[in-house]
Curated annotation (Swiss-Prot):
Effect upon mutating residue 368 to L: Activation of pro-caspase-9 independent of cytochrome c. Increased ability to induce apoptosis
MF term (GO), any: cysteine-type endopeptidase activator activity involved in apoptotic process
The gene coding this protein: APAF1
UniProt note on tissues of expression: Ubiquitous. Highest levels of expression in adult spleen and peripheral blood leukocytes, and in fetal brain, kidney and lung. Isoform 1 is expressed in heart, kidney and liver.
Protein name: Apoptotic protease-activating factor 1
Chain positions recorded as ATP binding sites: 154-161, 265
Description of what induces expression: By E2F and p53/TP53 in apoptotic neurons. Translation is inhibited by HNRPA1, which binds to the IRES of APAF1 mRNAs.
Organism classification: Eukaryota, Metazoa, Chordata, Craniata, Vertebrata
Major place of residence: cytoplasm
Species of provenance: Homo sapiens
Function (record text): Oligomeric Apaf-1 mediates the cytochrome c-dependent autocatalytic activation of pro-caspase-9 (Apaf-3), leading to the activation of caspase-3 and apoptosis. This activation requires ATP. Isoform 6 is less effective in inducing apoptosis.
Segments forming domain CARD: 1-90
């Protein structure tokens, strides 16, 4: 019975005994089921009415709450209202079916049982841990009334005792499993006399009426026997709770064949006892939300109102209940010390985090130290060795085998003792064991052993060197990943600077590590240990860091590129190049193929860092306000956050159910907003990646998001294809304001620097300015009007205003639409200036530099431009991306900017470096002549000038400034010819610069041009479906007419014959002297994309957009073989020199090698593809066999060499750009020339 009810009954006992008549009262109680017939008989046997009443009340006092209520109701029913009123205040809350009352969830029965059993009350500040409590209750219920053990184990301060008490605070558990009650014993660390005292006290408590013995047991054995008898006879089906058991010999004393729940740091204590055993491990962390809940209760604040330091405290201590409670109790007394206690945690000053509390220890270091001190002397030093481990790092057993020079079994036995005592944790993944320390244990060890740390790190390096060489670590070794990640850390911590430099400046180490973990961690280490590496050689350190930064997008891909070949592309002064050259020469002797880029000194790489965080297009990327981090989002539906300096990944979040279109950091960098095609806007914690809010009030995809520039009152603006802008207050669950006015999709929005205005851009052709406070429209500028022709205004013209950017002073706004940028005055709405970027691309994005008058502009034609907005002149071209550039953004200080692209990469550029560069870019229309040791390249540059480049010396002659569309060199380098966009053809004599111009002009752009071997005749083809044969010395011209559509290309044959192929699906053979068409082959239903002629001149091949290739004889009008199997357009083909093989390449990056005689497929050469990446980097556009037929070279997104015998790749050369159109190969197959889509010329030579 509840104490209150019992007291009330005792207080009014005299009045009740005087007045009540028991017979009618007992009838009611019998009918309620709370009094038995035998009890009624016992009452009736009393001689007087008062004695009968006294006997009834004595019986009720021994019963439960329900009996009290039944007695109260009987009094009311029989007219004793005054007496019932006396008992009214003592009426207990009767338990419901669940056994819980409405106030605390605990019945009076539970309270009474726990109070009598000495179970501790809940702490002053208490949060539930339902999952763990349920797990303990499930294990207890498994005992089913039989003797057994349930062990709760975990490290110091993880809340084991609180959980044990909470588990038995349950009505149904006590009533169903332990009706005999519970008995709590706080055991702790005991000697024999202390243990005897504990047992004596327990026996006394269990035998209060001294019915078994009137004296205390004199020794432990007697006490054990006494306990067994008491539990069996007086307290059957009761639960004995032993709190904080340290030793197995102590536990033996309580082994009395009863049901026992115990808490311990050492789960092996039950090894010495018999009976069923169940274990409940307790994690050392409460979890972030529970931790914050405890702090909020201590300081009496809402969880949402807690300062940022609260989150950091939970993060630092990993949610340790002991630490959170200690700090919470301290903060209750000193509520302004958040920063102070956080610093003490960060600086590992555990002694200063001290507070008397319900815990057994007043300070964190006490709780941990006692566990360590209790270790056996022979293993204490091994625990000290763990001081060198880093937080959150799981260490394979093999690492510690090397450290201690022991067999695996010996090491596992030692570590298991640490695990059993909750001093170490073990992650068992199949057969392999990995061990780790709690963060607080790491901090405790490093503080305790700080004077030994350098020697401990030196010890592990010395042991590593005995067992391993860094570059010989194999991925199948259990410990290899640990060494790749932490070898440099141990060397730096051991102050082994010489060894660290040797490691970090080794191309072998770079290769081995990047192949397994990618480049970001290595870049991080170069930054982390820069002060050490620079002491050795600053330039070398920069060489390696730049190499990793600029090749990061390649080094993170599969198949892993040949790092020696990448190293050969570095400047010749670079240490990376020198090591690569040395290694390549050794490997060439063993038959390996390597290429030297002999004209690379003319190339300047403008990117500072290239990262590839996504597996699909990157739609947006932005800097954090402190410039230290970059967030990016894209078509792979993820949000990525990485370090701006190294590209090291910090967060990867599966953010939305569809493509993520935009992301933005808040001004205080605490949050990141994302918006998506799935119509949702989400707010994330930028440090942890936790979802903070989800807003879904837009009815169409959300295109943009932007935070206010001040964190004083943080607002988020979003724009959607539903034509609306919305403002969101992060403290509210719903939209704060909706802005109506646009009549088409809102593409972009930006707050002004002072946050008073919000600018928005729309597909309706307008820029609108809104009052950020009232959400009213202030101004609207019709950008569309600037594109309308005054003479013929096309009102239905679509002008999409893509984006806008404010100047730093907020006086001007830059707006992008189509291929133009407009600058408007904010106050007058007047047009200040206009920038025209060119006809061939549209502007995707633009951004104002925060410091000066620079604007960065992203274009659809893969490039980025920098413009001076005052002079309206282009300052720089930045080429490097391989596809559309979707986003650009300056860093907060303007020193760098980032670009994000469809090619899955984000590039960082240094503003000053880019502005100083004025590199000339080439068009891909080039011709090459290999003459003895010379390589002469005729090329058209980006401003349509003609250049003659000596590939060996790099000398450039600028020949003409005509609008050249194609060009060629004569075989003996005496003449050059070029055609233009208007159809005109000219020949330039190189000796005297004399020009010969054809009187016979093509009607459309000239695309192909070639001299005959005697240099007297020039052949050209154009979009006009004609081929022109011009004997320029006699000024005579023959037109080859017969194709119905554009001539794709042509090839000269022997005996004045010419082979041509066309979009009309035919291949034709012409006599170029007479102009007669000699043969007409109807080859394909689709466009004929390429042809090649066998070296014996008896056959030719044709490939087509219909996904087939065919082999033809010049003597037959039907094909010899039709080659099927390609799944894309077959774009190129090539015969081997002996005419026995034919190679074909398609738009899926697949190459097939066929037997010419029977048409059988011999090899399928398809490079392995990453998810989202085309094989061969795109279309295969050109192929060429080596003279001996053993090797094949292919051009596509990059250049590959193949072993024809095996069909396997021999080497890959990654060009800076992509989409190579043609590869020019020297007759000896040792020199190769091509131009990528960035306009970079590559003259490659086989390394010998």
């Amino acid at each position: 019975m509840d104490a209150k009810a019992r007291n009330c009954l005792l207080q009014h006992r005299e009045a009740l005994e005087k007045d009540i008549k028991t017979s009618y009262i007992m009838d009611h109680m019998i009918s309620d089921g709370f009094l038995t017939i035998s009890e009624e008989e016992k009452v009736r046997n009393e001689p007087t009415q008062q004695q009968r009443a006294a006997m009834l009340i004595k019986m009720i006092l021994k019963k439960d709450n329900d009996s009290y209520v039944s007695f109260y109701n009987a009094l009311l029913h029989e007219g004793y209202k005054d007496l019932a009123a006396l008992l009214h205040d003592g009426i207990p809350v009767v338990s419901s079916s669940s056994g819980k009352d409405s106030v605390s969830g605990i019945t009076s029965y539970v309270r009474t049982v726990l109070c009598e059993g000495g179970v501790p009350q809940r702490p002053v500040v208490f949060v539930t841990r339902k999952k763990l409590v349920n797990a303990i209750q499930q294990k207890l219920s498994k005992l089913k009334g039989e003797p057994g053990w349930v062990t709760i184990h975990g490290m110091a301060g993880c809340g084991k005792s609180v959980l044990a008490a909470e588990a038995v605070r349950d009505h149904s558990l006590l009533e169903g499993c332990f009706p005999g009650g519970v008995h709590w014993v706080s055991v702790g660390k005991q000697d024999k006399s202390g243990l005897l005292m504990k047992l004596q006290n327990l026996c006394t408590r269990l035998d209060q009426d001294e019915s078994f013995s009137q004296r205390l047991p004199l020794n432990i054995e007697e006490a054990k026997d006494r306990l067994r008898i008491l539990m069996l006879r007086k307290h059957p089906r009761s639960l004995l709770i032993l709190d904080d058991v340290w030793d197995s010999w102590v536990l033996k004393a309580f082994d009395s064949q009863c049901q026992i729940l115990l808490t311990t740091r050492d789960k092996s204590v039950t090894d010495s006892v018999m009976g069923p055993k169940y274990v409940v491990p307790v994690e050392s962390s409460l979890g972030k939300e529970k931790g914050l809940e405890i702090l909020s209760l201590f300081v009496n604040m809402k969880k949402a109102d807690l300062p940022e330091q609260a989150h950091s405290i939970i993060k630092e201590c990993k949610g340790s209940p002991l630490v959170v409670s200690l700090i919470g109790a301290l903060l209750r007394d000193f509520p302004n010390r958040w920063e102070y206690y956080l610093k003490q945690l960060q600086n590992k000053q555990f002694k200063r985090i001290r507070k008397s509390s319900s815990y057994d220890y007043e300070a964190l270091d006490e709780a941990m130290s006692i566990s360590v001190e209790m270790l056996r002397e022979d293993i204490k030093d091994y625990y000290t060795d763990l001081s060198i481990l880093q937080k959150d790092v799981k260490v394979p057993t093999k690492v510690l085998c090397i450290l201690w020079d022991m067999e695996t079994e010996e090491v596992e036995d030692i570590l298991q003792e640490f695990v059993n005592k909750s001093l170490l944790f073990c992650d068992r993944n199949g057969k392999s064991f990995r061990y780790y320390l709690h963060d607080l244990q790491v901090d405790f060890l490093t503080e305790k052993n700080c004077s030994q740390l350098q020697d401990l790190h030196k010890k592990i390096i010395t042991q590593f060197q005995r067992y391993h060489q860094p570059h010989t670590l194999s991925p199948d070794q259990e410990d290899c990943m640990y060494w790749y990640n932490f070898l440099a850390y141990h060397m730096a911590s051991a102050k082994m600077h010489k060894e660290l430099c040797a490691l970090m400046f080794s191309l072998d180490w770079i290769k081995a590590k990047t192949e397994l973990v990618g480049p970001a961690h290595l870049i991080h280490e170069f930054v982390e240990y820069r002060h050490i590496l620079d002491e050795k050689d600053c330039a070398v350190s920069e060489n390696f860091q730049e190499f990793l930064s600029l090749n990061g997008h390649l080094l993170g891909r599969q198949p892993f590129p040949n790092i020696v070949q990448l190293g050969l592309c570095e400047p010749e002064t670079s240490e990376v190049y020198q090591q690569a050259k040395l290694q390549a020469k050794q490997e060439v002797d063993n038959g390996m193929l390597y290429l030297e880029w002999i004209n690379k000194k003319n190339i300047t790489n403008l990117s500072r860092l290239v990262v590839r965080p996504h597996t699909d297009a990157v739609y947006h990327a932005c800097f954090s306000e402190d410039g230290q981090r970059i967030a990016s989002c894209g078509a792979d539906k993820t949000l990525q956050v990485f370090k701006a300096e190294t590209g090291e990944k910090l967060l990867e979040i599966k953010a939305h159910e569809d493509e993520v279109l935009c992301c933005a950091f808040s001004t205080d960098d605490r949050f990141i907003a994302t918006c998506s095609v799935d119509k949702k806007v989400k707010i994330w914690n930028s440090m942890t990646g936790e979802l903070v809010h989800t807003y879904d009030e837009h009815s169409e995809q959300v295109n943009c998001c932007h935070f206010t520039n001040s964190s004083h009152h943080l607002l988020l603006a979003t724009g959607s294809s539903d034509c609306f802008l919305k403002l969101w207050d992060l403290n509210q669950k719903e939209c704060r304001n909706t802005m109506f006015g646009h009549t088409n999709s809102v593409n972009h929005c930006r707050f002004s620097p002072d946050d008073k205005l919000l600018a928005s851009c729309s597909a309706d052709g307008t820029l609108k300015l809104w009052d950020a406070t009232s959400a009213n429209e202030r101004k609207s500028i019709n950008v569309k009007q600037f594109f309308l022709n005054l003479e013929d205004p096309q009102e239905d013209m679509e002008v999409i205003v893509k984006c806008c950017s404010w100047s730093a002073d907020g006086a001007r706004i830059m707006v992008a639409a189509k291929n133009k940028i407009f600058l408007f005055d904010i106050h007058t709405s007047g047009l200040l200036g206009e920038i025209h970027t060119g006809h061939h691309s549209t502007i995707q994005y633009c951004d104002f530099s925060p410091q000066n008058h620079l604007a960065v502009v992203a274009l659809s034609q893969y490039c980025v431009e920098l413009w001076n907005t005052d002079s309206r002149s282009k300052v720089a071209d930045c080429r490097g991306h391989l596809s559309w550039v979707h986003g650009v953004m300056f860093s907060p200080d303007g020193s760098s900017f980032l670009t994000s692209s469809d090619d899955q990469t984000i590039r960082l550029w240094e503003t000053k470096k880019v502005c100083k560069n004025s590199a000339v870019m080439l068009k891909q229309e080039v011709d090459v002549v290999f003459q003895e040791n010379e390589v002469m390249v005729l090329a058209v540059d980006h401003i349509r000038r003609l250049q003659l480049i000596n590939g060996r010396t790099g000398q450039i002659d600028y020949l003409t400034e005509a609008q050249v569309s194609c060009c060629c060199l004569s075989p003996h380098l005496q003449y050059i010819a070029f055609g233009d966009e208007n159809g005109a053809i000219e020949i330039l004599e190189l000796v005297n610069n004399r020009i010969f111009q054809s009187r016979f002009q093509h009607k459309k752009t000239v695309w192909h041009i070639q001299f005959t071997a005697d240099e007297k005749t020039l052949i050209s083809s154009s979009d006009d479906a004609e081929i022109q044969v011009w004997n320029w010395q006699l000024d005579k011209c023959i037109f080859l007419r017969g194709h119905q559509e554009t001539v794709k290309d042509f090839r000269l044959l022997k005996n004045s014959r010419l082979l041509s192929w066309s979009f009309d699906g035919t291949v034709k053979v012409w006599n170029i002297i007479t102009g007669n068409k000699e043969k007409d082959f109807v080859c394909h239903q689709g466009t004929v994309l390429s042809c090649d002629i066998s070296h014996d001149a008896t056959k030719f091949s044709s490939t087509s957009a219909d996904k087939t290739a065919k082999i033809w004889s010049f003597d037959l009008l039907l094909p010899l073989h039709e080659l099927r199997g390609h799944n894309g357009c077959v774009r190129c083909s090539a015969f081997s020199v002996d005419s026995t093989l034919l190679a074909t390449g398609d738009d899926n990056g697949e190459i097939r090698i066929w037997n010419v005689s029977n048409g059988e497929l011999l090899h399928l050469c398809a490079p392995l593809s990453e998810e989202g990446a085309a094989t061969h980097g795109g279309w295969v556009t050109d192929l060429c066999f080596s003279p001996d037929g053993k090797m094949l070279i292919s051009a596509g997104g990059y250049i590959k060499w193949w072993n024809v015998v095996t069909g396997e790749s021999s080497q890959t050369f990654y060009t800076n750009g992509t989409n190579l159109k043609k590869i020019h190969v020297s007759p000896d197959f040792k020199t190769y020339v091509t131009v990528d889509n960035l306009g970079i010329l590559y003259i490659l030579q086989t390394l010998e």
